[in-house]
Every structure is written in C-alpha cells, then in structure tokens.
Amino acid sequence: LDISHRIIEKSAEFMTQEANFLKNCQHPNIIRLRDYNLEARRPYIVLDYLGNISLKNEIFNGDRRVSIKKTSNILAQICTALSYIHKKGFVYCDIKPSNIMSRRQKYTLIDFGLVRPIGMEITGGTIGYMAPEVLQNDSKNVKASPTLDIYAIGILLYELLTGFHPLASQKIYNNKNSYSFDRQSITDKTSIPSRASDLNPFLPKAFDGILLDCLNKNPKDRYQSMDVLLQNFEKAVARSI
C-alpha cells in the first residue's frame, strides 16, 4: 500500500464538496481521502499520492491513439467507478483525461469538486467534455444526470480510439496539450462527429454506434447507465478479437 500523501489547497466550496463526498467512498478506482480539516485556519484535504501521470499525458505524449484492448481496460475501471458514484445518487460532472490518474495500469478518478447529487443543478464543468444541454443553458437550470457523465465518457473513448477529439478538427488542434473548440459545434444538433472508424482504419465499425450513442445531442437517446455502456463495449471488443 502506497501511503504517501499530498496536501492540496483548493477553494473552500470545492474542497468541502470533495471532502464530503469522498469521506463516504470506498472504491479502488476513486482516489482515497486520508484526512481533512475544513475548520482550520487554512482548510486542507489529504489524498493518496498517485504520481503525476494522467490519462492526458498518455493521449498527448504518446501516439495519440490507444489500442482497443487498453481502451477496454481503462473503460472497465472508470465505468465501474462512475457506476458506483451514480448508484450512490451522484454525478461526477467533470470527466476528462487530466482527472484520470494512471499508475501501473490502474486508472483512478480524482478531483471531485464538481460532483453533484442527481437532480440538483450543476455548477460547471470543462468545455469540450460538457454535454450540449449544459452549454446551451450556461449550466443554469440543468439538473445533474448520469447522462452527462455518459456523454463525457463518449468524448474520452473517441479520443482514446482515434487520437482526436470528436468536436475539434485536426486543423484546430494545437501542440500545447489542449484543443480549441467552436461552442456552436457542440450545441448544434445537426453537427455530428466523424465516424471513429474513418479516423482509425483498424477500428471495427461496431464501435461507431457505441460512440455515437454516447454522444447523442439528446440525453434521452444516450445510454442511460454506465453498466449497459460497458457491456456493449465489451461485446464489441470480444467480436473484434
């Protein structure tokens, strides 16, 4: 057991939200809260130290494309963590590569400052991973739902399997480990991402439907649970071998 820790200073609101959620969590793919004091002169939380390599490093510093087998391993770990969160009645609300730490083939969700109870108004997110219904309303009056996390997982899967963000073309990719986004391309219901198999010739077309179901602009037409998404993905993986 690695018992090294790091102390992270955050805004009081996010820190309180994160500590209150993590103190009741026990999952191998969710960062572990070791200690916290929100009443101290300088409030703090103490979390397990997971190194400094995130999934973002693997995407941008590697070949910008991950094998189907490795993607399946990543998805299995993160989907089970998100399913656990949803079954506890919460939505993570900030899935992105930099919030997934990578260490010895283990992938761990970190940064729970935006987690919200299902049905409550969300407080933000990261453009490029926020669902279109959130951007359309500037986060106002948008209720937290598991379909928000499913949309973001669709973005992540697309990046892993193709090396590209589905809503940021190659022309506007920059070399500073980030993308540029046209907000309208995210919210426009007529804007459909390129099929992943068109960008990755080694990717079976069965994965196209899974990704497009995650990325549907209508939340009612997305997968409604992480468990079903994972089952469908694993079936596609089995057929591709």
Which residue ranges define each predicted feature?
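Activation segment signature within eukaryotic-like protein kinase domains
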Residues: 74-75
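AlphaC helix of the eukaryotic protein kinase fold
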Residues: 5-24
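AlphaC helix of the protein kinase catalytic domain
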Residues: 55-66
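Conserved short submotifs of the Hanks-type protein kinase catalytic core
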Residues: 40-54
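Catalytic-loop of the protein kinase fold
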Residues: 86-102
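Activation-segment/catalytic-loop signature of the eukaryotic protein kinase fold
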Residues: 36
